[in-house]
């Protein structure tokens, strides 16, 4: 059974992993990955950002600055206890991780289903971002009808664990502003980076993974594709591949 309660699983005193969840999500999205990494001997720290830390029918409004402040505080606490810190971001956790890596020393960076733009369907008249910054200004919350997980049993478990039944649009707009802040910094980010993206993602545009890969200044970077998963790949049909690739990357010598 999945839980949405933040946890610290301590192992090695040398290397800790900070796991960053997605917008409107929580620890449950990365719980199984965190447990796997702990079983492989790594220390794992998860958090629920401010505005994501209490159950509510409607997701409350929060800003990327609030989320990043929490990320930075946790990172700084970990640096007092561990020799090296790696960051694993999922969805909106990816631009947060990139923003952190642009200003602080990160051992390794893993980006799962990175949110750089919203998935555009051919039948949309305009990009989704255009709606968000126009008529979307009149609406605070929209229903979240179904979690983007193809694994039916895992989707049921995630539905039980999630805190919110809606998406807060002001928070989505704030996440897009964070992405605008991150893009100019990519060329200066030199940390070794693994990007894992599914071609079947129904939430974010999969080309965002290629954009990051091409723009990153790191000489050590890898883009790994999935072909059977939806957006929440750490809980989906190919989660074992995700776990193995992430652990292998974290353990590889630079």
Give residue ranges: language-model regions.
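Active-site nucleophile elbow and catalytic-triad environment of alpha/beta-hydrolase enzymes
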Residues: 168-185
